[in-house]
UniProtKB/Swiss-Prot annotation:
<feature type="compositionally biased region" description="Polar residues">
    <location>
        <begin position="627"/>
        <end position="640"/>
    </location>
</feature>
<feature type="compositionally biased region" description="Polar residues">
    <location>
        <begin position="244"/>
        <end position="259"/>
    </location>
</feature>
<feature type="modified residue" description="N-acetylmethionine">
    <location>
        <position position="1"/>
    </location>
</feature>
<feature type="region of interest" description="Disordered">
    <location>
        <begin position="229"/>
        <end position="320"/>
    </location>
</feature>
<protein>
    <recommendedName>
        <fullName>Uncharacterized protein YOL036W</fullName>
    </recommendedName>
</protein>
<feature type="region of interest" description="Disordered">
    <location>
        <begin position="590"/>
        <end position="640"/>
    </location>
</feature>
<feature type="region of interest" description="Disordered">
    <location>
        <begin position="1"/>
        <end position="82"/>
    </location>
</feature>
<keyword id="KW-0007">Acetylation</keyword>
<feature type="compositionally biased region" description="Polar residues">
    <location>
        <begin position="13"/>
        <end position="27"/>
    </location>
</feature>
<feature type="compositionally biased region" description="Polar residues">
    <location>
        <begin position="266"/>
        <end position="276"/>
    </location>
</feature>
<feature type="compositionally biased region" description="Polar residues">
    <location>
        <begin position="590"/>
        <end position="604"/>
    </location>
</feature>
<feature type="compositionally biased region" description="Low complexity">
    <location>
        <begin position="28"/>
        <end position="45"/>
    </location>
</feature>
<keyword id="KW-0597">Phosphoprotein</keyword>
Length: 761
């Protein structure tokens, strides 16, 4: 080892300071002001045990756990260099031990503390700091501190005295220079004189000297907590501040006087509030001359407290003033004033509240004297029909409007009023719906007979509303929709002439006719629907049985069509003279249906050429044509030939084997047609080209049924073989099943068509 030397160390005295010179390196010694002599024998015995175990492999570990002489905080970034320095320090301790040096230690509990901390490895908390030593006047052993408390004590001690030997911590200082405020380690080297040169009396006299430049007793005098917070802020140790919370038990030193205790308590509360933003419990005894704040209402009180809440959020140091203002604003006298105002407001609103039942009972009768008042309200509304029994009740000038009332000023009975009001209004709606016509007609005269009302309406209402209002007053509710429809048609110039006659008929109804409004039930609606369907079917049968000549002689029944001229069995554009709109709609229906009409339908339309005008009902004719279109929509064009001309090549049909595409999907765009993959394609080709033998419908239907069964059996065999061989995928099997279903459907439709021809030749 580098520092091993057989020569004893040299000592040099300079005044009251003790300095140890070892191989040209000056090492300061710890004064005995904070080290009790009672533990010297224990440490000497411990060091002798270390010397006996020097030959073992675990020598360095045992010395590291037992010896408290070297305490250093080693940074994680310089773990390799710190191991070398630690080994050099241990070698130095062995050399000092050979010179039979008496070492005085602090509390004996320190050995256990350092032994636990040294087991943690080369991390930041590997070597803990020296716990605070007792006061010079008190020789009591201080209790053990936790790691966080030792870190704060380390900061204060390192500020007052820094004992860094040049040869021990050179690499540590170079590697951790940027983090000296947070991770700076210091080594306390305690050293005493040899028993032969200096006795205990001289050593104690030297250590207890208060005029020394380095005094550990000053390190025990804790500074104020504001200085500690300044040290933390200056070093920039944000991570340490997050893991070491400030508490009164941690930072509270040994106090000597009650004045200092009070000062320390005040500084502790202020520093904890400013640094950590903790919520402080406000002491109401410290409020001096509170200023009474009397806001006029709860809203003003909330407005006064709003800026205080914002100020407390933005600045945590003003928390005490905010709490004081909120406590003052919440005094009992303020609460009493707010309650009086709320109760006064609730009493005022309770007097002015008009319930729905009171307004309904106080409804004034509608007479001719107040008709002008309602006439002035009518133009402001955009309603076409004027329902006078639904107009609001006029409010007199003596009544005050209902004021808004908060829930805090309401009693339990008033809070239930909306529910009772809804229930009562539902019952009143039921009764008013039954007695509405009786109330309006027995209590009030007819409004249309009032000359003043008519004159005022003529002066203020437009023509459309005036015409519809005169109609609505004389019609039951069932006819109101009709009158509104006519009034809308009157606004259009196209329908003005057509609707004027019907309007005159409606206006000419007598005023004294009593119309009774009856509520239609579900059974009556169903009966009316059935009668309407039956009447439509009877009318269509009668029209179909009538000949064209008889239809002309019967005259116009409903709306009339113009004449239809057909060319080659297809209707062309008609010559319209009257009712252009209705006739064009009818012809468009004929044109849409004429594309699918067969050639045989020309015989039915041929009598129309001879007649000038044929009046056919629109609804029945459209239904007839649509029924024909729906029956022939799914019919193939080859099936529209005459049933007597059926051709089929039986030999080709028996020898033909269709090609099936198994792996082709049924919904692909470019897929081959299913008719080409079946024998039905051959049948269609024979019909189109008239190839083969001429057959009647009965024989043809039998042949088609046989082919359908054969083809279905063929698909079944293919499906069974593919499933047993297992070379076909599941998707292909699904395609095959879908094709089988589709082909059966095509064959069924084809056979059904010719079977219908057979039944109806």
């Amino acid at each position: 080892m580098e520092h091993q030397d057989s020569s004893p160390p040299r000592f040099r005295n300079s005044g009251s300071n003790r300095v140890t010179v070892y191989n040209g390196t000056t090492l300061p010694t710890m004064p005995k002001s904070a080290t009790p002599t009672s533990s010297s024998t224990t440490v000497t015995t411990h060091l002798q045990n270390i010397k006996e175990e020097e030959t073992n492999d675990d020598e360095l570990t045992q010395v590291d756990r037992s010896s408290p002489r070297v305490l250093g905080r080693i940074s994680s970034t310089s773990s390799s260099s710190s191991n070398i320095d630690l080994r050099d320090n241990l070698d130095m301790l062995h050399e000092i031990e050979k010179s039979n040096t008496n070492i005085s230690l602090s509390a004996p509990n320190l050995h256990e503390e350092l032994g636990v901390l040294s087991d943690k490895g080369n991390s930041k908390e590997e070597l803990a700091l020296l716990p605070p030593l007792p006061h010079t006047g008190e020789m009591e052993i201080t209790p053990q501190f936790d790691i966080n408390e030792a870190i704060f004590e380390r900061d204060d001690i390192s500020h007052s005295s820094r004992l860094e030997p040049d040869d021990v911590l050179t690499k540590l200082a170079n590697s951790t220079r940027d983090a000296t405020g947070e991770d700076q380690g210091f080594v306390v080297m305690t050293h005493g004189h040899d028993a032969s040169t200096n006795d205990d009396s001289q050593l104690s006299a030297t250590i207890l000297d208060n005029q020394t430049s380095f005094d550990l007793s000053k390190a025990l005098e804790m500074t104020s907590h504001s200085n500690i917070s300044n040290i933390i802020n200056s070093s920039g140790s944000e991570g340490r501040r997050s893991r070491t919370p400030v508490s009164n038990s941690t930072l509270k030193p040994n106090l000597s006087s009650p004045e200092s205790a009070e000062r320390e308590a005040n500084t502790t509360s202020s520093s904890s509030t400013s640094d950590h933003g903790a919520t402080m419990q406000y002491d109401p005894k410290k409020i001096i001359t509170p200023i009474p704040v009397l806001p006029s209402s709860v809203r003003e009180q909330q407005q006064n407290n709003a800026p205080l809440r914002e100020r407390s959020r933005s600045n945590s140091s003003a928390l005490a003033s905010t709490l004081r203002d909120t406590i003052i604003s919440g005094l009992p006298q303020n609460i009493n004033s707010v309650e009086r105002k709320l109760s006064r407001k609730s009493n005022r609103s309770r007097k002015n509240t008009v319930t729905f039942e009171d307004r309904l009972q106080k409804l004034p009768p509608l007479s001719t004297q107040i008709s002008n008042q309602y006439a002035k309200v009518a133009p402001a509304e955009n309603n076409i029909a004027l329902h006078f029994h639904n107009l609001p009740t006029p409010v007199s000038n003596t009544q005050t409007p209902v004021t808004f009332q908060s829930e805090s000023g309401l009693t339990g009975g008033e809070k239930k009023m909306p529910f009772l009001r809804r229930a009562s209004s539902a019952l009143l709606r039921k009764t008013s719906a039954k007695n509405c016509s009786n109330l309006t007609r027995t209590n009030t005269p007819t409004l249309s007979t009032s000359s003043t009302f008519e004159s005022d309406l003529n002066a203020r209402q437009p023509m459309l509303i005036r015409r519809s209002s005169t109609i609505d007053n004389k019609l039951p509710r069932r006819q109101l929709s009709c009158s509104k429809l006519y009034s809308r048609l009157n606004s259009d110039s196209k329908f003005a002439n057509s609707s004027r006659a019907s309007e005159e008929v409606l206006v000419s109804t007598p005023n004294d006719t009593e119309h009774v409004y009856r509520k239609t039930s579900l059974g009556s609606k169903i009966k009316r629907g059935f009668t309407r369907i039956l009447s439509d079917s009877n009318n269509s049968k009668e029209i179909l049985t009538l000949s064209p000549k008889s239809m002309v002689t019967t005259g116009p029944t409903e709306l009339s069509f113009s004449s239809l001229s057909t060319v080659g069995g297809h209707p062309t554009t008609p010559v319209s003279k009257e009712n252009d709109r209705v006739s064009i709609d009818g012809v468009s229906t004929f044109n849409r249906a004429s594309t699918s009409l067969p050639e045989s339908s020309t015989d039915d339309i041929s009598p129309l050429r001879e007649e000038g005008k044929i009046n056919v009902p629109k609804r029945t004719s459209s239904r007839k044509i649509l029924s024909k279109n729906s029956s022939k929509k799914n019919v193939l064009p080859e099936q529209q030939t005459k049933p007597s001309e059926i051709y089929l090549d039986k030999e080709a049909l028996q020898s033909f084997v269709p090609v099936l595409s198994v792996t082709e999907g049924t919904h692909r765009i470019n897929r081959s047609s299913l008719q080409t993959q079946s024998t039905i394609g051959l049948c269609i080709t024979n019909l189109r080209n008239k190839e083969g033998m001429k057959l009647n419908a009965k024989e043809y239907v039998e042949i088609l049924a046989q082919q359908q069964r054969k083809e279905d059996e063929r698909y079944a065999v293919l499906e069974r073989k593919f499933a047993s061989c297992r070379w076909c995928s599941d998707k292909d099997l699904q395609y095959l099943k879908k094709k089988r279903i589709s082909m059966n459907k095509i064959w069924s439709d084809y056979v059904r068509f010719y079977r219908g021809k057979l039944n109806n030749p």
